[in-house]
Amino acid sequence: MLDHTRAPELNIDLDLHASNSPKGSMKGNQFKEQDPCPPQPMQGLGKGDKREEQGLGPEPSAPRQPTEEEEALIEFHRSYRELFQFFCNNTTIHGAIRLVCSKHNRMKTAFWAVLWLCTFGMMYWQFALLFEEYLSYPVSLNINLNSDKLVFPAVTVCTLNPYRYTEIKEELEELDRITEQTLFDLYKYNSSYTRQAGARRRSSRDLLGAFPHPLQRLRTPPPPYSGRTARSGSSSVRDNNPQVDRKDWKIGFQLCNQNKSDCFYQTYSSGVDAVREWYRFHYINILSRLSDTSPALEEEALGNFIFTCRFNQAPCNQANYSKFHHPMYGNCYTFNDKNNSNLWMSSMPGVNNGLSLTLRTEQNDFIPLLSTVTGARVMVHGQDEPAFMDDGGFNLRPGVETSISMRKEALDSLGGNYGDCTENGSDVPVKNLYPSKYTQQVCIHSCFQENMIKKCGCAYIFYPKPKGVEFCDYRKQSSWGYCYYKLQGAFSLDSLGCFSKCRKPCSVINYKLSAGYSRWPSVKSQDWIFEMLSLQNNYTINNKRNGVAKLNIFFKELNYKTNSESPSVTMVSLLSNLGSQWSLWFGSSVLSVVEMAELIFDLLVITLLMLLRRFRSRYWSPGRGARGAREVASTPASSFPSRFCPHPTSPPPSLPQQGMTPPLALTAPPPAYATLGPSAPPLDSAAPDCSACALAAL
C-alpha cells in the first residue's frame, strides 16, 4: 500500500525533472558561450603537468601516477596507517585482523591491541631464553656400556732404590760424610761408632768447603703481638749450639742469585724433611755431571729385580718390557709399552688372566738419605703415555701380595665452544718435550721445563731437555738453586700460567684401580717358595719376608664404560623450539615470519622516503623560485601546453570598463603543494583552474 502511494510521487519527480532539463541545458549552453573555460575546482596540477619547486635548478617532471589499469614494478604504501591496515587485513598471523575489524568499537580495539602486544612480548621473551640456552653451549653426557676384548695397559715398576753409579760414587760418599756430620751437629746423631766427635768436627771443616749451601739453623720470627723486634737469626751448623729441639727453630739452607744481591732461606720445620731436601739438591747436581743419565745398568738382567713374570699364564720375555732410570725411584721397567710389537690383549677377566710379578725388594746398595721407604713403586698408564711416578704411582709393601683390579673408562669431550679441551695438543702454546702423545701432565711438565730453561739457563734433571741445553749444576750455574725454588713457588701458584695453558685432551682413557692386600707367602709355604725362588734365579734371599713382594694386575670385567658428550641444544632443536613457540602464541608458520620481515622492510622504506622528502624541503635553495617566476612571466600564454588549459584561448569579448582595474597577468602557476604529501592527487583533480586559464589568456 505504501508502494502505491510512493509511485505517483516518483513519477511527479521525474516529470519535474523532465520539464526542468531543457532549461538547465539552456543555461549550460549560455554559460559555454560566455565563458571559454568552464569552472573547475582547483585540486592541483593534472596528470602530466610539470611542477615547479624551489631548488637550485630546473627539476625533472614528476613521474606519472599509475592508473587503475596499470601497476608499477615496485610500490610502497603512502602512510603508516595504510600499511598497517593492509598488513592486518592480509596477514596470516592470528589476532592481527582484530585490530582493524573492530575500529568502530574502541574498547575492543584497545583490548585486542594490548592482548596482541602482550602475546608478542611473551613470545620474544621465550625466544630470548631459547637463544640464551643455545649460546651457553650446554652438553649432554651419554653413557654407553661396551663389552669386548681389551688391550692391556702399560705397567711401570720401579725399585725404589736410587742407584750409585760408578762414575759419581766417590762424590756420593763424600756427600754422605757431610750429611752425617750435619746430623751430628744438629741432633748429636752418631752414625759411625768408629769416629769420635772431635775427629768428626775436624773433618767436617774440610768437607763443607767442597759443597756450597750448607744447612743452617734459623730462628723463626716472633709473633707480631709479642712486642719484640723481628729478626732473622741464622747460624751455621758448625757452631757449638745446643741440639735443635725447640719449636722456634727451623732448618734450611741459603740460596742467592748470581751477584748475591738477593738471598733467601729454604727452610723446613721438620729436620728430616730439611736433611732429605738438602741431600736431594746436592744429589741432583752430582747426577747431572754424568755424560748419560741412563747408562747401562749394573743390574745385569731383569731377574735381579723381577723373579717371575707371567701374563695370561705365559712367561714374559725381554721383548715385553723396556727400562729407564729415575733419579729418585731407581731402575724402572715398563711392560707392554708402545715399543712392544705385540700388545697384550685380555679376553677374560680375573687374576689368572692378567700380569703377575714377583719382585725383589732388598736394598743392598741403598741410599738411606735419599729414599726412606722400601718395596717397589708401580703405575698403570696408557701405551703412548710416559710414566709420571711422582703423580700417579703407588708403593708396594714387602711381604705382601697386592692384587689390583682394573676397570676401563673412556671419556670423549667436546671442544670448541662446548668445552676447553684439545684434540692432539697442536693448538696448545707449549712444546711437547716428551716422545709421546699429548696429555695434560706432559704439557705441564714441558711448560715448567720451558720456563726453567728460559729463566735459569739450564734444564731440570727430572724432565727431558731439548738439544743443546745442559742439566743444572751449581758448578756451572751457581744460582740455579735460587732460580729453581723461586720458579717452583710461582709454578705452585700458577703464576707461570702452565695450568691455564695446558688444556685437557678431548679423548682420555682412564683405568679405575682398586687394590687388595694379603700376607705373602704364608707361614706354612714361605720355606719352599723362597727355596724355589733362590734356585730359579741363582740368588740367595737374606731377609725372606722383607725381600720379596708379589703383584697381580688384571681386569675386573671386560665391560667398559664410555662417557661421550653431545650438544644438548643443536641448531635443529633450536629451530624446532622457536617454531613451537611461534605456533603456540600466534598459530603461524615460517611464511608469517616472512610477512613480519616484509612489514619491517616497508616501515623502513616509508620512513626513509619521508626523511628524504623533509630533507629536500628544508635544505633546497630558495633562490630557484624567483628565477622560475621570471621565466614563466616571460613565456607567452600561447606557449602553455594544451593540457594546462584544454580550451582554446580567445580575447575577451569586451575590454574592461573605464575606471576598473585591469586584472593582473598570472606570472607563474600556483605551487603544487598537493604533490608534497605522501599521497597522489585524485584522478578527478587533473582539470585546470578556469581562472588561471583566463588570466593566462590575457
Curated annotation (Swiss-Prot):
GO terms for cellular component: acrosomal vesicle; apical plasma membrane; ciliary membrane; cortical actin cytoskeleton; cytoplasm; cytosol; external side of plasma membrane; extracellular exosome. Ubiquitinated. Can be ubiquitinated at multiple sites and undergo monoubiquitination and polyubiquitination. Ubiquitination by NEDD4 or NEDD4L inhibits the ENaC channel through endocytosis, intracellular retention and degradation of its individual subunits. Residues 200-270 are annotated as: Gating release of inhibition by proteolysis (GRIP). The keyword Transport applies. Keywords: Cell membrane, Cell projection, Cilium, Cytoplasm, Cytoplasmic vesicle, Disulfide bond, Flagellum, Glycoprotein, Ion channel, Ion transport, Membrane, Sodium, Sodium channel, Sodium transport, Transmembrane, Transmembrane helix, Transport, Ubl conjugation. Originally identified and characterized by its inhibition by the diuretic drug amiloride. Residues 1-110, 611-698 are cytoplasmic. Its main location: membrane. Pfam families: ASC. It is found in: Apical cell membrane; Cell projection, Cilium; Cytoplasmic granule; Cytoplasm. GO terms for molecular function: actin binding; ligand-gated sodium channel activity; WW domain binding. It catalyses: Na(+)(in) = Na(+)(out). Detected in kidney, lung and testis (at protein level). In the testis, detected within the seminiferous tubules but not in the interstitial cells (at protein level). Glycans are attached at N190, N259, N320, N339, N424, N538. Belongs to the amiloride-sensitive sodium channel (TC 1.A.6) family. SCNN1A subfamily. This is one of the three pore-forming subunits of the heterotrimeric epithelial sodium channel (ENaC), a critical regulator of sodium balance and fluid homeostasis. ENaC operates in epithelial tissues, where it mediates the electrodiffusion of sodium ions from extracellular fluid through the apical membrane of cells, with water following osmotically. It plays a key role in maintaining sodium homeostasis through electrogenic sodium reabsorption in the kidneys. Additionally, ENaC is essential for airway surface liquid homeostasis, which is crucial for proper mucus clearance. This is Epithelial sodium channel subunit alpha. The lineage of its organism: Eukaryota, Metazoa, Chordata, Craniata, Vertebrata.
